[in-house]
Amino acid sequence: MKETDLIIIGAGPGGYKAAAYAAKHGLKVVIFEGAEVGGTCLNVGCIPTKTYVHSGSFTEARERMTQVVPQLRSGVESILSHPNISLVREKGVFVDANTVGDYTAKNIIIATGSTSKLIPVPGIDSPEVVDSTGLLNLETLPKRLCIIGAGVIGMEFASVFNRFGSEVTVIEFLKECLPAFDSDIAKRLRKQMEKAGITFNMSSGVKAIVSEASPSGKRTKVLFEQKGKELSVEADVILVATGRKPNTEGLNLEAAGITLAPNSTIPVDENFRILPNSPLKGEDTSQKVSPLRGDLEGSVFAIGDVNGRQMLAHAAEVQGIHVVNRILGIEDNIRFEVMPAAIFTNPEAACVGPSEDQLKEAGTPFECHKSFYRANGKALAMGETEGMVKLCCEPKEGRLLSAHIFGAHAADLVQEVTAYITLGATLRQLRETVHIHPTLSEVLIEVN
């Protein structure tokens, strides 16, 4: 066996960022990757979808994707060429709690990401059914696209393919789209997408996917129930966007003494170290803390989608950096509860902190302040007047608690508020910060 300081399984955003950070601080790192470096985000996720979002046609989007993805992948490979990093191009498999493949180390990070989760309904294995990767691999634009699931993935693809010219229908089990977003923002976005021609069937449960012969050829339908009525929609392609599940198969976790939680995630403590005891069936491990041991040297960690905490590429990155800091004995001030998120529809939506509904449910006193894009000079000049900002803050001191934005460049705007919340700043301090005129950022200081 070859000894090293740190083993990382998975070269996605969390894995390769942790490797680069550890190498910079003098650790010898071995990182395993059985597929392309960069993970889902770079190869078949956030980056390819953004080339679609910012392309004028389906053909242009595919061409740009084939240029952008290899370029960024080459950048990741360059990062991993650091003299302190050894990239092993094979899947990392545990031999024991300190050994992966032919390498042994005191510290191991599992950063294997997640994969699409399909719903168990008849016909789900039909050739017309694809996940997000399959949709990105389509060579021709579908005339009719049915999307099952109105989460971030489903809504982004609905927006993009509608703009490309597909007839898009979305079927969602819940009463509103984007359950992780503020309900007010989610509703406004859905209404705007409906105006663009997308059909939404909310509070609807998919029952089956069936195909039948017809004089014009094969017909495929999605059968669903809505308020007791049996309905159906025909589609040429059916995207299943009903969530993701952690990638844990084939890692031989049992050899390392690791037991999955009931939801198939790897349970971790507040430092993302894998909990030493097997979780009980139905036990909530999200807040469970295992005893710390100094700087945590001699531990196995799980970061990113595989621990189920926050399934976001940037969450995986900061979790990886935090783990390396703990291994090195370095304290940091990363606030994992202040985690911004965005959806790149047209218009965009973004958020950071608890929604208005969550604040009410928690009994947290708060004030809500709003402003609208239609009153912003830059938005008017751009022709992007559909949008709103909602800032929640404490009633007395005015400390910022959350931000919820719907409109052009929402993902960029929310980042400023994220910084203020992280620093414990107030709404007054935000308002008293000078903003360039004319910019969309002025909507933040124009709240009532």
Residue ranges and their predicted role:
Residues 68-73, 137, 142-146, 152-212, ...:
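Rossmann-like dinucleotide-binding cores of NAD(P)H-dependent redox enzymes
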Residues 27-33, 110, 166-172:
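Short beta-strand "acidic-cap" motif of Rossmann-like dinucleotide-binding folds
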Residues 125-141, 232-277, 281-287, 291, ...:
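FAD-site-proximal beta/loop scaffold in flavoenzymes
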Residues 2-4, 40-102, 181-207, 356-358, ...:
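N-terminal Rossmann-like dinucleotide/flavin-binding domain of flavoprotein oxidoreductases
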Residues 9-14, 18-35, 40, 47, ...:
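Flexible, glycine-rich terminal cap/loop adjacent to redox cofactors
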Residues 46, 112-167, 171, 196-200, ...:
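Glycine-rich dinucleotide-binding loop and its adjacent helix/turn
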Residues 1-12, 141-151:
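Beta1/beta-strand and adjacent pyrophosphate-binding region of the FAD-binding site
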Residues 2-4, 101-107, 228-237:
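Core beta-strand elements of the Rossmann-like FAD/NAD(P) dinucleotide-binding domain
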